[in-house]
Amino acid sequence: MDPPAVGEAVKRVIVALDPARRGDVDRLLDMARLVCGVGAGIKVGLPMLALGGSEALAEAARLCKGGGLRVLDLKLADIGYIMRLAAESLSRGFDAAIAHAFVGYEGGLVELKKTLDGLGARLVLVVSMSHPGSREVLDPCLDKLLAVARRVEPWGVVAPATRPEVVARVRETLPTTVILSPGVGAQGGKPGDAICLGGADYEIVGRMVAGSPDPVSALRGVAEYIAARCPEKLLHSSTGNGPS
Amino acid sequence: MDPPAVGEAVKRVIVALDPARRGDVDRLLDMARLVCGVGAGIKVGLPMLALGGSEALAEAARLCKGGGLRVLDLKLADIGYIMRLAAESLSRGFDAAIAHAFVGYEGGLVELKKTLDGLGARLVLVVSMSHPGSREVLDPCLDKLLAVARRVEPWGVVAPATRPEVVARVRETLPTTVILSPGVGAQGGKPGDAICLGGADYEIVGRMVAGSPDPVSALRGVAEYIAARCPEKLLHSSTGNGPS
């Protein structure tokens, strides 16, 4: 039996399943079955679509049904008409779909939100990214991105575990919006950086778990690391908008 | 035989082939064969991938080989690692691939450019979009987006035919970079708005041609409209970076 904080922490870790080659697709789909019952859920996107087709996306969503959040991460960033077509054909079976806030509301995200609402899927908007290039345009324009997020009212936003100060600023601006934070592990963020330091609800881990020979142990290891850093925060999630 | 300006204009019109449902995929692939020898080329993206799989993307590129520009438009907007995976698995056979300038250089576009260079494909960066939402974040941050474009040095950039003044500003800032302008037709831009008023090299037309029962005639109609507006500009392309 996990100590309470570890049990709570593991439910805050989403595993990103991004195949690097066709041979990875089946291995990562098998992994979905393993990690789904343990962690917060899974995230699949363009690499899975490119290498495994829409069938692999649908299979990932099916395997994780009832086992946590199923996040479709195509980083949608086109005009409303095109994002709508993509959402209609790909987001069935997913709990949430990720798009970019910088696309803007008019003729863009307003159409996507309507489509996702109709499919019972939640919208997550990227307001900052985990790689260094995010400092060049996204971060200087964060105020405008947060203004779009306030207008669109997504269920969640993405802010980077690699820069917890950005997560903290997003949390301050959007106190009741769920924050998902990629960038833990291969990209340099340490488990707990976003949840403990920034106030995020979820951390997204990719290669650190998906590249492990024993993904469930690796996932537990991430959770233990987070739990050791901020047990009180995990047990008394201040935002009240923890995973539902 | 087309009058010279019409002959030149038709070589400046790229047809976007975006299926709205699975049944459209084959029809649009057949259309690729028709329009490729006539216009400047084709653009396919997420709807074709979602509804026809990577096989449909590859088929579109194959059908248009030697018949003009083949542009892959996934609006890539992720960290470098993910964009690299997508480019490696999908951009073979394409002449150019579109990504978003706002992703930034470090850990983002620098990796994508290297991958595309290795595949012999050219990078096109979106610096502004054709829908009204582009006024909310992208346009106010255009200076920063153009700075990223100057650093990345893509073969081309995307700027909207729906706002020719933005095209003109991009042309002024990036005098030798090819400008591709979507937004003609269904989105409200008139043929020639980007080329004649803004100095773009190509206009991208989607449903106006792809939705026509006679796409080649519709394509010629667009070209005649452009040619009537600025014959001299077409015949003496000032930027010298006309389609090559």
UniProtKB/Swiss-Prot annotation, chains A, B:
Catalytic activity: orotidine 5'-phosphate + H(+) = UMP + CO2
GO cellular component: cytosol
Pathway of action: Pyrimidine metabolism; UMP biosynthesis via de novo pathway; UMP from orotate: step 2/2
Presence of keyword Flavoprotein: no
EC number: 4.1.1.23
Binding site for substrate: 18, 43, 73-82, 130, 182-192, 206-207
Assembly and binders: Homodimer.
HAMAP family the UniProt entry points to: OMPdecase_type1_A
Name the record gives this protein: Orotidine 5'-phosphate decarboxylase
Gene: pyrF
